[in-house]
From Swiss-Prot:
The gene is psb28. It is a peripheral membrane protein. Gene3D superfamilies: Photosystem II Psb28. One of its GO terms (cellular component) is photosystem II oxygen evolving complex. This is Photosystem II reaction center psb28 protein, chloroplastic. Residues 1-34 form a transit peptide. Keywords: Chloroplast, Membrane, Photosynthesis, Photosystem II, Plastid, Thylakoid, Transit peptide. Transmembrane segments: none annotated. The keyword ATP-binding does not apply. InterPro entries: Psb28_c1_sf (IPR038676), PSII_Psb28_class-1 (IPR005610). HAMAP family: PSII_Psb28. Part of the photosystem II complex. GO terms for biological process: photosynthesis.
Length: 147
């Protein structure tokens, strides 16, 4: 799919539902990896996370900085002892973005979720993150809407 077609598709998604400001998919599902799929979220290097997160965005009025909050319910990283969580790594064809601001949620002593925060300190960081999310959303059948 061309970049302009992807931008048009996202423009439609943005204008369709203006009640929330989230990339999200309500149910956990299997992610089908297609040829050409280049986006991934990882907590352990080399282990793609298949649980699709809810993502909430905030941005300053002048656009100089912003924050993305990722909420993963029952992520794969807790299954089969895949390794220690060393951060959250957002990888696509442009490279990798990462954060170490990652917290596990526990209920009755068992891990049930992960919350991560990715801070964007410049407008260029924001634009780069949005390009990643557009690709990730396309690969995982997500939509975007503003609140």
């Amino acid at each position: 799919m061309s970049v302009s077609a992807l931008q048009q598709r996202f423009a439609l998604a943005r204008s369709f539902n203006a009640s929330t400001k989230r990339f999200s998919k309500s149910a956990r599902r299997s992610v089908v990896v297609r040829a050409g799929t280049t986006t991934s979220i990882q907590f352990v290097k080399g282990q793609n996370e298949t649980a699709v997160p809810e993502v909430r965005l905030t941005r300053s009025k002048d656009g100089s900085n912003g924050t993305a909050f990722f909420i993963f319910s029952d992520p794969d990283v807790f299954e089969n002892g895949q390794g220690d969580i060393t951060g959250m790594f957002l990888t696509d064809e442009e490279g990798e973005m990462s954060t170490v601001d990652v917290n596990a949620k526990f209920v009755n002593g068992k891990p049930t979720g992960i919350e991560a925060r990715y801070v964007m300190k410049t407008e260029a960081d924001w634009n780069r993150f949005m390009r990643f999310m557009e690709r990730y959303a396309e690969d995982n059948g997500l939509g975007f809407s503003k609140k």
